[in-house]
Regions:
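Short helix/strand-capping connector loops at secondary-structure junctions
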Residues: 78-84
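Non-catalytic interface/targeting segments
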Residues: 1-56, 62-63, 82, 90-116
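Short, glycine/polar-rich helix-capping loops at beta-to-alpha or helix-loop-helix junctions
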Residues: 72-78
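Glycine- and other small-residue-rich loops at beta-strand/loop junctions that grip anionic moieties
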Residues: 69
Length: 116
């Protein structure tokens, strides 16, 4: 049985990777099974949720396994890894290219596991 991965990327428009987590209007969240994107959605950061949810600005990441950023502070990295979310970095501005890079890496990893 394949593991389900949920990858979040901060974005204001669903197309461009946002450089700052704090000012991001939301996240593109992709559900991946067997190195294939089976669902993709935009989750908006609503002020009401940020102000009232237990996790504040991280409420949209509650079911995510990975987050892809341009830059992240050590403190935010610690918070996310403490929640069990793996933090990855990209130098791509395109959400689709960042996801494709992730899938290529995941595919190579799965292939290496099968050979070993």
């Amino acid at each position: 049985m394949s593991k389900i991965l949920k990858i979040a990327i901060p974005s204001d428009d669903g197309v461009t990777v946002k450089t700052s987590l704090c000012s991001s209007r939301g996240y593109v969240v992709a559900t991946i099974i067997s190195v294939v994107i089976v669902h993709q959605e935009m989750r908006w950061n609503l002020l009401s949720e940020i102000m009232t949810a237990c996790d504040g600005r991280y409420y949209n990441l509650h079911d995510c396994t990975h987050v892809i950023f341009h830059v992240i502070s050590e403190r935010r990295r610690e918070i996310l890894t403490g929640k069990g979310i793996e933090v990855l970095l990209t130098d791509n501005n395109s959400v689709n290219v960042a996801l494709a890079d992730f899938l290529a890496t995941a595919s190579a990893y799965e292939h290496a596991k099968q050979i070993a």
